[in-house]
């Protein structure tokens, strides 16, 4: 059992489990979510629980449950657990016990430094070019934990690897669940970078990195030396850079396994697919949104031996660079980004320069998510009506792009837009519709699984300026 902020809730959860005869390992202090995922595997636990608000505003809280492989639960476990919760008719039915009694009974076991050491040790194994880090140890890194749990593991692993010029945003280094310096500590929002950008300009930072409060997601800005400005990286962008870097380094050193696979989701940038082709690596991308679905594929590989997992990523700023855990890990991701930055610095380049090179090699890809929110029961009904309308009345165009094929993940069908002919397709079950568009573009619509929102995802490809303009034009037409 661990938590990102809520100390009391962590202990209450542990004592409830102890009262039901369950042996519990309880972290002695706040820890990152990926470390809990690692600990479940390391300690051979049956389940893990993390109490966290994650990147949400301070009013929110969450209860993440992990299975014995360290992955967040999927069906049927999720439905079975919530059914038990709904069976509670009165809070007096919930058992608890005294902390000292639980310790004396051998049910409550406090863990800490030994798990930290084992976790950091696994991250060290991921480093591919330690000599590159030593040559560029003066890389100026600006880092903010956004009042969360990333501070200790991030600064520790960077220091141990030899990065000597790390500048922490002190105002955001204090763990505080009220997140006093930001409205929402979300790496996807520009607000989260205000203090980091200010510090970077002051110290001449080359790389700006932030982790969300439970340290599973990462955000990044990189320095553009040609224009003397900082550029924002989306999750798709730094995910593509890492896919390219990891596959390139492993291929060059002979460390790429047989039948390698990059695992991602259906809304990832198509650039990742092109990078995988270059390195003869399977891009496992027909997966539902959410990192638990990536973890599910990792488990399948272990059972079948069909592929060997190399790297996993999703568009929402989450990556897992190894098999030591089963949830996205900003600490390991940040570490590899810093290694890649050192590698390119030794060649007179920044990560922004490398991003431009990737665009020049594979084409300019741009992705965007548009969200519409509808509150209450009427809002929920409106969302379902919107997606059903799209299902019942197939569109021929999305903005200025012609529709070529329509994949309905709820019905399990593939439809040719020109002929209207449909046939069965092997698709994971979900209430979403994917449109394959002309010119390498795509569009997906789905209701959010956690909020009263409907989400529209768009990906386009082309020349830099032309694609940028068409992307904005299409988003406007969608809304």
Regions found by a protein language model. Name each.
Residues 1-9, 467-474:
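Conserved small/polar residues in nucleotide/adenosyl-binding loops
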Residues 8-12, 37-41, 59-65, 152-157, ...:
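Short acidic, glycine/serine/threonine-rich loops at helix termini
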Residues 8-60, 164-219:
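N-terminal small/polar loop signature for handling phosphorylated ligands or for N-terminal nucleophile
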Residues 61-194, 198-200:
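Gly/Ser/Thr-enriched, mixed-charge loops and adjacent short helices
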Residues 206-207, 229-231, 249-446, 453, ...:
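Phosphate-binding and adjacent anionic-ligand microenvironments
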Residues 454, 458-470, 475, 479:
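Generic C-terminus detector
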């Amino acid at each position: 059992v661990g938590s990102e902020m809520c100390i009391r809730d962590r202990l209450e959860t542990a004592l409830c489990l102890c009262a039901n005869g369950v042996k519990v390992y309880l972290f002695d202090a706040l820890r990152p979510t990926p470390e809990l995922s690692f600990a479940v595997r390391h300690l051979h636990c049956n389940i893990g629980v993390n109490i966290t608000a994650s990147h949400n505003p301070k009013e929110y809280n969450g209860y993440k449950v992990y299975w014995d492989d360290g992955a967040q639960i999927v069906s049927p476990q999720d439905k079975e657990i919530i059914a038990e919760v709904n069976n509670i008719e009165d809070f007096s039915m919930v058992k608890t016990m005294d902390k000292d009694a639980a310790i004396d009974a051998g049910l409550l076991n406090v863990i800490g430094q030994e798990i930290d050491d084992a976790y950091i040790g696994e991250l060290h194994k991921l480093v591919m070019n330690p000599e590159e880090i030593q040559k560029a140890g003066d890389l100026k890194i600006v880092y903010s934990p956004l009042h969360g749990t990333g501070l200790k593991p991030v600064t520790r692993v960077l220091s141990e690897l030899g990065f000597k010029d790390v500048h922490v945003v002190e105002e955001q280094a204090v763990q505080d669940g009220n997140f006093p310096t930001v409205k929402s500590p979300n790496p996807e929002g520009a607000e989260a970078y205000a203090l980091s950008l200010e510090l970077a300009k002051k110290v001449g930072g080359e790389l700006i990195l932030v982790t969300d409060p439970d340290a599973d997601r990462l955000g990044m800005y990189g320095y553009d030396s040609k224009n003397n400005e900082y550029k924002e990286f989306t999750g798709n962008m730094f995910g593509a850079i890492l896919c390219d870097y990891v596959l390139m380094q492993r291929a060059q050193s002979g460390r790429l396994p047989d039948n390698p696979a990059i695992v991602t989701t259906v809304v990832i940038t198509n650039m990742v697919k092109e990078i995988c082709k270059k390195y003869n690596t399977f891009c496992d991308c027909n997966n539902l949104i959410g990192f638990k679905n990536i973890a599910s594929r990792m488990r399948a590989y272990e059972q079948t031996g069909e592929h060997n997992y190399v790297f996993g990523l999703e568009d929402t700023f989450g990556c897992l660079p190894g098999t030591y855990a089963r949830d996205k890990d900003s600490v390991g991701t940040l570490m590899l980004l810093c290694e890649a930055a050192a590698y390119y610095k030794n060649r007179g380049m920044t990560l922004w320069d490398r991003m431009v090179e990737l665009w020049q090699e594979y084409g300019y890809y741009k992705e965007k998510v548009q969200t519409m929110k509808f509150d209450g029961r009427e809002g929920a009904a409106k969302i379902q009506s919107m997606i059903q309308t799209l299902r019942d009345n197939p569109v021929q165009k999305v903005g200025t792009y012609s529709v070529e094929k329509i994949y309905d993940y709820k019905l399990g069908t593939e439809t040719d837009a020109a002929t209207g002919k449909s046939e069965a397709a092997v698709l994971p079950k979900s209430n979403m519709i994917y449109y394959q568009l002309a010119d390498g573009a795509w569009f997906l619509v789905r209701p959010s699984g956690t909020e009263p929102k409907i989400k529209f995802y768009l990906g386009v490809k082309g020349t830099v300026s032309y694609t940028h303009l068409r992307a904005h034009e299409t988003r406007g037409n969608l809304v």
